[in-house]
Amino acid sequence: MNNQQKIKCPICGKQNTWSPDNQFRPFCSERCKLIDLGEWASESRKIPGSSIDPESIVTSNNKQDNEDEQ
């Protein structure tokens, strides 16, 4: 019995099989995989959320370092 799930490529919508044989899953091809990577790299795709002030990260890390030293 073949229980391989059919999925749509998130880039082009082409039907493909979710299986270990598909090295590009969930994409249908290397081309679609690279298009997706390019969209993330150019920030046209991003995870929604609020921006983080880089200065607050430095301050937070410095506080943690000081606490670790004590």
Curated annotation (Swiss-Prot):
Region (Disordered): 43-70
Cofactor(s) in the UniProt record: Zn(2+)
Record keywords, A-Z: Metal-binding, Zinc
Entry binding sites for Zn(2+): 9, 12, 28, 32
Note accompanying the cofactor annotation: Binds 1 zinc ion.
Keyword check for Metal-binding: yes
GO molecular function list: DNA topoisomerase type II (double strand cut, ATP-hydrolyzing) inhibitor activity; zinc ion binding
Gene3D superfamilies (UniProt xref): Erythroid Transcription Factor GATA-1, subunit A
Keyword Metal-binding: yes
Cross-referenced HAMAP family: DNA_gyrase_inhibitor_YacG (MF_00649)
Family: Belongs to the DNA gyrase inhibitor YacG family.
Role played: Inhibits all the catalytic activities of DNA gyrase by preventing its interaction with DNA. Acts by binding directly to the C-terminal domain of GyrB, which probably disrupts DNA binding by the gyrase.
Protein's name in the database: DNA gyrase inhibitor YacG
